[in-house]
UniProtKB/Swiss-Prot annotation:
MF terms (GO), sorted A to Z: aminopeptidase activity; metal ion binding; metalloexopeptidase activity
Signal sequence residues: 1-18
Residues annotated as binding Zn(2+) 2: 206, 245, 354
Required co-factors: Zn(2+)
Predominant subcellular localization, coarse grouping: secreted
Record Pfam families: Peptidase_M28 (PF04389)
Protein's UniProt name: Leucine aminopeptidase 1
Length: 387
């Protein structure tokens, strides 16, 4: 996720509070022997604006608030499509009766429990062994949900999408009547931008909050017999991306493959940072869902606003985050309709991210529940829509 200059103020606190790796942990932090190498990477900071940088220069850009896509391994992303997919979304939500009992089943306590475990890893840095371990733990949770729901008997499954850097992305699939696909995404990795390979990075908000938000939405979605039996019009996928912090690496790899193989993705929603509200409240503003309006599909975004109005108990606020601010940018570049929602107006979002201070105690689980309601409402409505 993004990094603001305000986060630089957390440097001294981060260095003071973040423990260096203890003796018994030293073999686990980094998969690659060199924490920072002289290898150069091709990044894109705006559409068509590219430059070569070292790894340390990547982190310096992030510390200074510059988002980018690292396109070194995916330079072809977006070049194979002749035009963007044009999808006609429903004019309004229509499945309120079916969704009412599902929405009531969403659980703050389950999100809290999952996030407690997820943030207990020293870091989820994508090049670290902890990043690999956290991804394996998360895949196990997803597979257990599918098995416990009996959805595996109807073809639902979850798997790793493998990457070269150690931490793999995760894709959970619930087949529908057609191969046309609706994707819900969050990123699983975390980072401490001051010393990524050493300092702790609990990543509670960025993006542990989004990770457990969509995990909880998946759990409840799987209680729908119509969904697990494949009666939905469209196939549903939940993605947990690796290496978002390194330049949207995991999501680029996935959507590059989807573009190459002609996958028909009708919609993609990214949930990145869903739990922090204190700055909004301190500013005297009402709690709200931040709906990103730049570099997104306007029609999907308009439908998401209707979903918030129908299924959430708080309002939305329109806001902007710039180019490549989260993984929806990878789907968009591949030509797929994508959207992004965040915890607040962007200016009030969490400034503890990318430090050791991004911890569970600063999050509002009632607010995360609103994001889970949005996720569940959207994916259920689109599962049965003729897109």
């Amino acid at each position: 996720m993004k990094f603001t200059n305000l986060s630089l103020l957390a440097l001294s606190a981060s260095l003071a509070s973040a423990r260096f790796v203890e003796q018994h942990e030293t073999d686990q932090v980094i998969l690659n022997s060199n924490a920072v190498t002289d290898e150069r990477y091709l990044i894109e900071t705006a559409p068509g604006k590219q430059q070569w940088v070292t790894e340390e220069e990547k982190w310096e850009l992030r510390r200074n608030g510059q988002n980018f896509m690292d396109i070194t391994e995916t330079p072809e992303l977006g070049t194979l499509r002749t035009s963007s997919v044009k999808v006609k979304f429903p004019s309004k939500p229509t499945l309120q009766k079916d969704l009412k009992p599902l929405l009531e089943d969403l659980s703050k306590s389950k999100m809290h429990k999952n996030l407690e475990t997820f943030t207990s890893f020293h870091t989820r840095y994508y090049k670290s062994d902890y990043g690999r371990q956290s991804s394996e733990w998360l895949l196990e949770q997803v597979q257990t949900l599918i098995k416990d729901a009996g959805a595996d008997k109807y073809g639902a499954h979850a798997r790793h999408f493998k990457h070269s850097w150690g931490q793999n992305s995760i894709i959970a699939t619930i087949p529908g009547q057609k191969n046309s696909t609706v994707v819900i995404g969050a990123h699983q990795d975390s980072i401490n931008l001051f010393l990524p390979s050493i300092l702790s990075a609990p990543g509670a908000d960025d993006d542990g909050s989004g990770t457990v938000t969509i995990l909880e939405a998946l759990r409840v979605l799987l209680t729908s017999k119509d969904i697990i039996k494949g009666k939905g019009e469209n196939t549903i996928e939940f993605h947990w991306y690796s290496a978002e912090e390194g330049g949207l690496l995991g999501s680029q790899a996935i959507f590059s493959e989807y573009e190459k193989t002609g996958r028909d993705v009708k919609a993609m929603l990214q949930q990145d940072m869903t739990g922090y509200t204190q700055k909004t409240l301190d500013a005297g503003e009402p709690e709200s869902v931040g709906v990103i309006t730049d570099f997104v599909d306007p029609d999907l975004t308009d439908f998401i606003k209707k979903i918030v109005t129908e299924y959430c108990t708080i309002d939305f606020v329109e806001t902007r985050c710039g180019y490549a601010c989260s993984d929806h940018a990878s789907a968009s570049k591949a030509g797929y309709p994508s959207a992004f929602v965040i915890e607040s107006d962007f200016k009030y979002s969490d400034d503890r991210i990318h430090t050791s201070g991004d911890t569970l105690n600063f999050l509002n689980f009632d607010h995360m529940l609103q994001h889970a309601r949005l996720t569940l409402g959207l994916v259920y409505e689109l599962a049965f829509a003729k897109l």
